[in-house]
């Protein structure tokens, strides 16, 4: 067995393990299901916070109304995440997800510290937004997974109330989940009380200090995004869906980083994170493959390459690369593998350098829908400069691809010419026979 075959076999084995992991699936799918909520909040933030003096003066009387959806979406996303992750995980175990989702929501809230304010003789207990947004996202993931798993465990142990026949299914399902729900709720209520007695003061503070800050520092570095890109591209070269594997691992970190930026942008504060999911999307997702399309369409002589370029161009404009990956193919192609792996990394590094030197702005963290085209996907991150940067990186990526494509193009063109010559000779021979 060759190295390539061994790598592919092992890679597919471990990739399938990651893809089949129920906890990873629940977190990834749970966050993905929140995309409509995140988009609502992102547009609310963008429309209320665009730094254009004339525009700000125009919307000043109703700016707070425009910003209101962001307060209950972006700044409260952890609440939605706690529900959706538990819902998805329960479903993966074959259980109805609604009750575990609500129990997870309760558990998350009961673990959330309540702030006390005094206004004269009036004492106000308030649930602030401090832990409901980006800072509470990792805690929401943990709570969502634990509550759903505990609920499933109690149901599997038959700790349920069985209703007699004839009771409507909706009522029967509600009562069957009552005991597991109460048990989980009691456990998390006790847990909340125990965390109050620790030096952290709450479960949220513990997760944020011990887990979320270190992971975001690690995941939000230029080195981590380059390594993730290299792994993703390498997996694609061996025919493994690299995006599914890599994004399943890094999406929670990148989402939290984006949410912090979006909240800072809305508040008019400097954005704290440079490398985020939005940064990845802008610089790694479009220009590299469009550079390949330019080479195929305008610099290649092979008819086959030109046809593949025409077929792949529309998808590449919207970040869809499979026609090129499998059409050329790039899969198991050692020559094209080199520029395919390197070009997005080069784009990311250049984007990073231009950002730290203040030539380009930091992306605001908007959750742009998948399929948003190049340029628009950059502009939606807060500046036209990002859209222009995407375009300017296309010729750079074309230069990276050109020498490698040229090797294959020359070979393909010679084969096509030889085939055409043979076909013409065969036609002439047939004409002589007929005449």
Where are these regions (language model features)?
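Hydrophobic alpha-helical transmembrane segments
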Residues: 69-81, 136-139, 218-238, 270-289, ...
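Alpha-helical transmembrane segments in multi-pass membrane proteins
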Residues: 40, 78, 82, 86, ...
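Inter-helical loop and helix-membrane interface segments of multi-pass membrane transporters/permeases
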Residues: 48-69, 106-135, 164-166, 198-216, ...
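Membrane-interface helix-loop-helix junctions at boundaries between adjacent transmembrane segments
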Residues: 115-185, 189-223
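Transmembrane alpha-helical segments and their short flanking loops
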Residues: 2-18, 60-63, 120-121, 259-269, ...
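Early transmembrane hairpin of solute transport permeases
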Residues: 16, 20-161, 331
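Generic multipass alpha-helical transmembrane bundles of integral membrane proteins
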Residues: 182-300
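Alpha-helical membrane segments and immediately flanking helix-loop junctions
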Residues: 79-89, 102, 106, 265-335, ...
């Amino acid at each position: 067995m060759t190295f390539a075959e061994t790598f592919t076999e092992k890679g597919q084995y471990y990739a399938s393990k990651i893809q089949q992991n129920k906890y990873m699936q629940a977190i990834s799918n749970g966050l993905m299901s929140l995309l409509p909520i995140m988009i609502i909040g992102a547009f609310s933030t963008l429309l209320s916070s665009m730094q254009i003096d004339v525009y700000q003066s125009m919307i000043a009387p109703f700016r707070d109304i425009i910003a209101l959806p962001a307060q209950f979406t972006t700044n409260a996303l952890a609440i939605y995440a706690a529900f959706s992750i538990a819902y998805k995980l329960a479903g993966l175990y074959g259980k109805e997800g609604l009750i575990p989702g609500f129990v997870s929501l309760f558990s998350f809230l009961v673990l959330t510290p309540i702030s006390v304010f005094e206004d004269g003789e009036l004492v106000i207990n308030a649930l602030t937004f401090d832990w409901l947004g980006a800072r509470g996202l990792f805690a929401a993931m943990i709570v969502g997974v634990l509550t759903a798993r505990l609920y499933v465990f109690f149901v599997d142990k038959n700790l349920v109330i069985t209703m007699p026949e004839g009771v409507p299914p909706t009522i029967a399902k509600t009562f069957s989940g009552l005991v597991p729900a109460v048990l989980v709720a009691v456990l998390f209520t006790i847990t909340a009380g125990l965390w109050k007695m620790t030096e952290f003061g709450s479960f949220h503070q513990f997760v944020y200090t011990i887990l979320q800050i270190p992971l975001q520092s690690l995941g939000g570095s230029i080195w981590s995004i380059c390594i993730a890109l290299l792994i993703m591209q390498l997996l694609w070269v061996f025919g493994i869906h690299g995006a599914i594997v890599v994004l399943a691992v890094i999406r929670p970190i990148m989402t939290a980083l984006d949410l912090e930026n979006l909240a800072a942008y809305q508040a008019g504060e400097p954005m704290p994170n440079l490398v985020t999911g939005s940064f990845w999307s802008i610089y790694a997702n479009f220009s590299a493959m469009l550079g390949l399309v330019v080479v195929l369409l305008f610099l290649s002589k092979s008819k086959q390459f030109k046809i593949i370029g025409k077929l792949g161009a529309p998808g590449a404009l919207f970040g869809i690369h499979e026609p090129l990956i499998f059409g050329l193919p790039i899969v198991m192609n050692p020559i094209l593998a080199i520029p395919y792996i390197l070009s997005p990394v080069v784009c990311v590094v250049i984007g990073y350098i231009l950002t730290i030197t203040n030539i380009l702005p930091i992306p605001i963290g908007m959750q742009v829908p998948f399929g948003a085209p190049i340029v628009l996907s950059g502009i939606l991150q807060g500046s036209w400069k990002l859209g222009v940067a995407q375009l300017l990186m296309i010729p750079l990526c074309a230069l990276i691809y050109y020498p490698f494509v040229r090797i294959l193009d020359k070979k393909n063109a010679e084969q096509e010419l030889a085939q055409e010559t043979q076909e013409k000779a065969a036609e002439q021979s047939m004409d002589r026979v007929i005449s």
